[in-house]
Amino acid sequence: MKLFPPARHLAVLALSGVTFPVSAADVLSERNIGMELARDIATEAVLACRQDGYQVSAVVVDRHGLTRVALRDDGAARFTLEIAERKANMTVMAWTDSGQFRQSRADIRPELNHIDGLIVMDGGVKILSGGYNLGAVGVSGAPGGEKDAACARKALENLNERIEFAIE
């Protein structure tokens, strides 16, 4: 008895009309932040802090915590890049601004600060469009996390119309 190679089995199944149900979990469709918007958010955040006299870094991560853009202003300490990224990652993990998370979950702050890539500090702000979480922006380098967060929010305000209409 001769066995059919796998390709022939598939051809026979296809021609016979056998179908396989597709589950919603088989294919994912998601909204995520594009490079151009990420770049412009980071730029606006750095410029907002610069207007206030602060040299900062801004990092935009996508909804999975992957870095899309990282900018360090002239004069910003090199460590601000890592801190900004960790703030953005914390925001993505919690799906709330890092400052709000810090206030509401001080009980687990020490443990989270030991997880590589996360830090529980003010300065991470979520990026939302049409109800979708697109990612987060983290800012570091101003004297105090609340000032970092203000620069991130100013960037999002400056690009609000573009962000709101990003999801069609």
Predicted region positions:
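N-terminal signal peptide c-region/cleavage motif recognized by signal peptidases
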Residues: 19-21
